[in-house]
UniProtKB/Swiss-Prot annotation:
GO molecular function terms noted in the UniProt entry: 2 iron, 2 sulfur cluster binding; dihydroxy-acid dehydratase activity; magnesium ion binding
UniProtKB keywords: 2Fe-2S, Amino-acid biosynthesis, Branched-chain amino acid biosynthesis, Iron, Iron-sulfur, Lyase, Magnesium, Metal-binding
Residue sites binding [2Fe-2S] cluster per the record: 122, 195
Alphabetical GO biological process terms: isoleucine biosynthetic process; L-valine biosynthetic process
Species annotation: Aromatoleum aromaticum (strain DSM 19018 / LMG 30748 / EbN1) (Azoarcus sp. (strain EbN1))
HAMAP family xref list: IlvD (MF_00012)
Annotated signal peptide: none
Name of this protein: Dihydroxy-acid dehydratase 2
Catalysed reactions listed for this entry: (2R)-2,3-dihydroxy-3-methylbutanoate = 3-methyl-2-oxobutanoate + H2O; (2R,3R)-2,3-dihydroxy-3-methylpentanoate = (S)-3-methyl-2-oxopentanoate + H2O
Amino acid sequence: MPQYRSRTSTAGRNMAGARALWRATGMKDGDFEKPIIAIANSFTQFVPGHVHLKDLGQLVAREIEAAGGVAKEFNTIAVDDGIAMGHAGMLYSLPSRELIADSVEYMVNAHTADALVCISNCDKITPGMLMAALRLNIPAIFVSGGPMEAGKVKWEAKVISLDLVDAMVKAADSSCSDAEVDAIERSACPTCGSCSGMFTANSMNCLTEALGLSLPGNGTVLATHADREQLFLRAGRTIVDMARRYYEKDDASVLPRSIVTFQAFENAITLDVAMGGSTNTVLHLLAAAREAGVDFTMADIDRISRKVPCLCKVAPAVADVHIEDVHRAGGIMAILGELNRAGLLHAELPTVHSKTMAEALSRWDVMQAHDNAVFEFYKAAPGGVPTQVAFSQNRRWKELDMDRSHGVIRDRANAFTQEGGLAVLYGNIAEKGCIVKTAGVDESIWTFTGRVRVFESQEAAVEGILGDRIVAGDIVVIRYEGPKGGPGMQEMLYPTSYLKSKGLGKECALLTDGRFSGGTSGLSIGHVSPEAACGGAIGLVEEGDSIEIDIPNRRIHLAVPDEVLTARRAAMNAKGHKAWKPEGRQRVVSAALQAYAALTTSADTGGVRDVTQVQR
């Protein structure tokens, strides 16, 4: 029978000093026999996805206490990728994932907490906390802040839905007046919550449902809706029950590594491919698998992507569908239900809320549910009022979207495409693979051959695009922006948005060892591995070369003879300490980022740290 971890600092005569400090936090005599539950919150006033979380940790804490536990809240950092986008701030985004994971580990282990509630939401916070939960392997549950309502604006006598990407694209479109751009800017992000499309934050919060670590609706019920409060309350009650099951009944099935197995990662990437999730999810799932000790690789993602259909298309893949529309169609449980009926899901796996996923689907999949409360839950609608307050409205749709032939969520027979929304490409320029979000690529350019235009940084590429140096048929190559080469693996949302604003969204491709925002669409191929800074062939590409892209056959090829590439590699290696570094790039890299770069790996392993580089 495992002992409560907290007894290390609460039991015995020698812990009198520690207990004195615990008492100073408000603990009483009777509390020292209870499970101590850590609440990792991520409130910050910098990030709209987190601005409403300030009081939600204490909401969970009160529920933990009512269920017989002791709650102790702490906070992590949170970087807003949208605000950090397009300047040096983006260098810090991916490294913040490791800091978040480490900070959760530090706090939980230093204070010997028994279990963990993760209150996350945006791009690197959910992955960082997921990595920490799997690293710690104590009872854990996730509850996110929820998605933002989609923006609305009246445009040419018609009301259209908006999101962050629309503001970026229109701002770079010279045909849009200042007044039009201002109207979009003021309407694109109307409420608190994670940005409203199937971008990275929402993708990751949806994937926690598939992994079995969060409650139904976690990925889709709006931050502003009153229904979301119940997720926080249920999370507080559930985590105390999980702690007692593990420590008092020796039930290890509640531990993260018991729930998030190889098959659970298969479920997660199956959902990801089916819903056309952000390419960043691949990076984060690979990193999480490493923490879980699960041998889940790019090869597994490639295998799954070939057999899973695309059942759902959400912005940026389509302009008029957002997460609130996915919720109305039954949310993630509805997509998982369709995947299960197609024989593509491991439904026998446990979750934090049900004995098996199959049991959960029998209750929560609207196509097989019988409980009217479930139907009402998925009718939760946007309030349409700008606000930064959680649970501030209770509007409902009159009816659900149950149309599986032409609706937001499709069944397999009526899938958008029979191949899924993400694909892994391999070739001589990406021997360890690269990722493309096929859900956002027009099928007319699934095969594409173009002339290479080489840029040594995102900034240089933006200058080239806005300076009209890119024409139809070009392939923009941005290198030395990987985890090590950036460092920090910047997102390339501005270059792709500017290509769209120039009318080149279906006429050009972009290839990088960096990554893309979940808001990216078009023929945008990222995560090229090995990256240029690690000796990858993308570092050998020259201006005017030709690259062949073949998504149906999962192939990408630099059309240069092998002997020429061999000669280029020899010439590069002959540069000594200047080899595999960007020529002419002026970029200040702080000591913190240099430390990250020294340990990080390429995207094919999740951009995780390799501590063997410093082990003696």
